[in-house]
Amino acid sequence: MSEKVVFSQLSRKFIDENDATPAEAQQVVYYSLAIGHHLGVIDCLEAALTCPWDEYLAWIATLEAGSEARRKMEGVPKYGEIVIDINHVPMLANAFDKARAAQTSQQQEWSTMLLSMLHDIHQENAIYLMVRRLRD
């Protein structure tokens, strides 16, 4: 049995409906998309980064011990999944950027990919990441 950690990124949102939305109501639809899942909003997530379990643990161990960023990323082993949203971007971006100097080339590649995803969230606040531990 192999284990891995998958970072899935929000790729799009849509409302589950069969009828076309009248133009007059389109602003309500946009507002509903912005606030979340109250009107049948469906999030579509796509896998953007996959790490073997043991290598994920070694990667997050490069973050400063006791730091908020490390505690956040340790939520995956503790809870099985975490969500990374706009509120976590500055903290995680700074921590992973700082840790790159002590990382292996593979870890640096993952950090670069994660930093790119964090940049996407910074540019579009509705984007988020779901990070999950998966067992095959």
Curated annotation (Swiss-Prot):
Coiled-coil residue spans: none
UniProt superkingdom: Bacteria
GO biological process: protein-containing complex assembly
Listed InterPro entries: Formate_DH_maturation_HycH (IPR010005)
NCBIfam families assigned to the protein according to its UniProt record, in alphabetical order: PRK15084.1
Family (UniProt): To E.coli HyfJ.
Role played: Seems to be required for the conversion of a precursor form of the large subunit of hydrogenlyase (HycE) into a mature form.
Record-given protein name: Formate hydrogenlyase maturation protein HycH
Higher taxonomy: Bacteria, Pseudomonadati, Pseudomonadota, Gammaproteobacteria, Enterobacterales
